[in-house]
Amino acid sequence: MRLPNYYTAPEFERAGLRRREAEWIRARLLDPASVVVPVWRSQNLVIEVAGGEPRAASLTLEAVGGIAADEIEERLAHGHLVFLGVVDERAHFALDVSASETPLETLRSPTLAAAGIAAADGGSEIGVRFADLRQLAGRLERSEGALLALARAMLFWHSRHRFCGACGAPTRSEEAGHMRRCTDDACKTMHFPRTDPAVIMLVTDGERALLGRNRNFVAGMYSTLAGFVEPGESLEDAVAREVMEETAIRVGTVHYHSSQPWPFPANIMLGFYAEATSTEITVDEGELEDARWFERDWLRTHVDDESFRLPRLDSIARRLIGDWLAE
């Protein structure tokens, strides 16, 4: 059985039907046992314990001092609170603290106990900080990474959709943060969270795989090719087009592998294997710095080399390569 990709959590209950139940949402926001997932300018709150791995700092409402009853409607309307779903029968909300220059003080400097992290996690020294989820590179538990990714993605969407794309009037958050509506009575356009589809593919030629290098990559890193799906294009056509545009390689058979949400800022990565029907590479220097064929056995023996790197462990790119190497 194939494990889900990182940033996915099948066990997480989104409870979508609850989003329109205003009284239920309000009751959960008055429940001290409900949980908030703080986000500050697209960074997530994490707790680091000396000698252990970082943990997501999901805090109970009680731990952050609660939310005043007369502030709930305003915070929901502005999209500063977003209902994420239910975990272990407790409602979880993304909490935007981006307006604060001192976010940890805004959260009343959460302690080890408040964050629910046991001292047995590996050390007596703790650090609470806001961090870029990408830099944690899959070190969080899978379920925690998925929760933080969802909170980050939803609040990013709200921050970019304060105004109506149809008429320019301000928008207001509804359905517990899962829709924004234009406030102009003549418009009232509804806006929903968007996810931009992108294909990501490992192109193979027998025992060889095609990997490319973007000039922004860290030294020595090569990865799979990828690109956005264009309007009116099938996923398979997008795979073939992107590979041709970036490397001049033609592909034939295309096989779906899996997908991965990638909230950096708002993508869904659709993973494929593609079989090459040509082998001569011509790199589009506007897209890539380099592209080359790598033998499977060579990759197996150089995965941990200091001079050569594969993509991060939390990425579907690494999953595509890893599964191919395991064959």
Predicted segment positions?
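N-terminal strand-loop-strand
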Residues: 180-223, 250
